[in-house]
Amino acid sequence: MKKVHAPIHPGEVLLEEFMLPYGISQYEVAKVIGVSPRRINEIVHGKRSITADSALRLARAFSMNDAFFSNLQADYDLAIERDRLEAVLPNISVLPAVAKAMLKTAV
């Protein structure tokens, strides 16, 4: 399956959807959430993942639910790995015991 576009790093979402519209600088975000400006810079430039620690801090600062930024990161990571394993995943079959159990519940 050919991908239409590359997955969007959650740092790009942070920058484009949360920081730029409100005129918020990387320094301001870092100061408010208590992390180094370098961490925010690396996140918005796609050089660093959003950890659970960063996700919780960002969620509080931007009034989002606790899982918002970690879900963005998880979705991004899955998309990257899905692309990387594109040739492998179709060759993995359901475990026989699971397939058997699924047949029993389908009846």
Model regions and ranges:
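Short alpha-helical DNA-recognition segment
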Residues: 23-42
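A short, Lys/Arg-rich alpha-helix, primarily the initiator
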Residues: 1-24
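Short, basic-rich loop-to-helix N-cap that marks the start of a DNA-contacting helix
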Residues: 47-60
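Peripheral/terminal regions associated with large enzymatic or DNA-binding modules
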Residues: 2-7, 60, 66-68, 104
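The DNA-recognition helices of helix-turn-helix-type DNA-binding domains
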Residues: 36, 47, 62, 73-76
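Short, charged recognition helix plus adjacent turn
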Residues: 71-107
